[in-house]
Amino acid sequence: MSSSLCVLPWMHLATHPNGGASLCCRSNHNDAISWARKNDNLVLLDNDSLNDIVNSDKFVNVRQAMLDGKRPVECEGCWRDEDNGIESKRQYENRRWSHIIKYLEKTA
């Protein structure tokens, strides 16, 4: 398993009042950096499907970065916690969903 993998970008999203969707509640929301995007345009719940969101450029790129062992900037909240010895949401969710991680490693 990649040391930076998190199950959430495969099976979860956080929604926002304006219709935007991001990777999770702990992801970096500065300038909507973690929000679903396709061709640099926000993918919004009122215009797009859930499939469009979870397969948006942003979600796919973050999943691939995790599979490649990179630490996406969108997930800096978890990296900061882990670097300070605090259990992150990523670590908690990976433990909670450990039975599906082997399936995630096959696809971004």
List each language-model region with its residue ranges:
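Short, basic/aromatic recognition patches
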Residues: 1-7, 11
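Secretory pathway export signals and precursors
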Residues: 2, 20-21, 71-74
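Conserved alpha-helical substructure of the radical SAM core
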Residues: 3, 32-42, 81-108
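Cys/His/Pro-rich metal-binding microdomains
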Residues: 7, 22, 76
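A structure-centric signal for secondary-structure junctions around beta-strands
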Residues: 9-10, 18, 39, 72
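N-terminal pre-triad scaffold of radical SAM enzymes
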Residues: 10-24, 102-108
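C-terminal accessory region of radical SAM enzymes
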Residues: 26-80
